[in-house]
């Protein structure tokens, strides 16, 4: 193999390692058996959520994971592998891929990295059931607003009662 080819492969490994480090979530799937239309649909769903799906050779993934400091992923990088990288939302890739896998037997989740930790299939499935960050923030805001809303209703009830008494 020429020095140029080796340098090119090393650059790809470096690029994938950097992408693994920068991503809050990287889910590895086996998409063997998916039709072109199904892959296109999956890519569109992921792209709409800001997630990149790349098909990467297992040897490149193994070396990149080691370089990025993620050990113990050799059993994940077996067979055809595609990786969904998300730099913003750790939950979105797991949700989208699990939903797609539930409706399509040809897609299987193999493992991945979530928030800098190696994640097995069970962990990824657990993440897939969590609400998104925006939903969690909305729930939190609702909980903060609940006491204020209760006070407002109580004050309104007192004001209504007072106006009824004044009218009578």
Curated annotation (Swiss-Prot):
Superkingdom field: Bacteria
PROSITE patterns in alphabetical order: RIBOSOMAL_L10 (PS01109)
Alphabetically ordered keywords of this record: Ribonucleoprotein, Ribosomal protein, RNA-binding, rRNA-binding
Record-linked SUPFAM superfamilies: Ribosomal protein L10-like
Keyword Ribosomal protein included in the entry's annotation: yes
Gene Ontology CC, one term: large ribosomal subunit
Name of protein: Large ribosomal subunit protein uL10
Family (UniProt): Belongs to the universal ribosomal protein uL10 family.
UniProt GO molecular function: large ribosomal subunit rRNA binding; structural constituent of ribosome
Function: Forms part of the ribosomal stalk, playing a central role in the interaction of the ribosome with GTP-bound translation factors.
GO biological process, one term: translation
Keyword match rRNA-binding: yes
Subunit architecture: Part of the ribosomal stalk of the 50S ribosomal subunit. The N-terminus interacts with L11 and the large rRNA to form the base of the stalk. The C-terminus forms an elongated spine to which L12 dimers bind in a sequential fashion forming a multimeric L10(L12)X complex.
């Amino acid at each position: 193999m020429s020095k140029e080819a080796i340098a090119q492969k090393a650059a790809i490994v470096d690029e994938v390692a950097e992408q693994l480090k920068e991503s809050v979530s990287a889910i590895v799937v086996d998409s063997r058996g998916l039709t072109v239309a199904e892959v296109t649909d999956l890519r569109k769903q992921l792209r709409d959520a800001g997630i990149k799906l790349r098909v990467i050779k297992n040897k490149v993934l193994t070396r990149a994971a080691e370089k990025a400091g993620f050990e113990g992923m050799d059993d994940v990088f077996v067979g055809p592998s595609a990786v969904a990288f998300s730099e913003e939302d750790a939950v979105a890739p797991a949700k989208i891929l699990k939903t797609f896998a539930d409706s399509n037997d040809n897609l299987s989740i193999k493992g991945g990295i979530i928030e800098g930790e190696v994640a097995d299939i069970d962990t990824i499935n657990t993440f897939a059931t969590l609400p998104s960050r925006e939903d969690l923030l909305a729930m939190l805001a609702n909980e903060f607003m609940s006491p204020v809303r209760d006070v407002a209703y109580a004050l309104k009830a007192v004001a209504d009662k007072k106006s009824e008494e004044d009218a009578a």
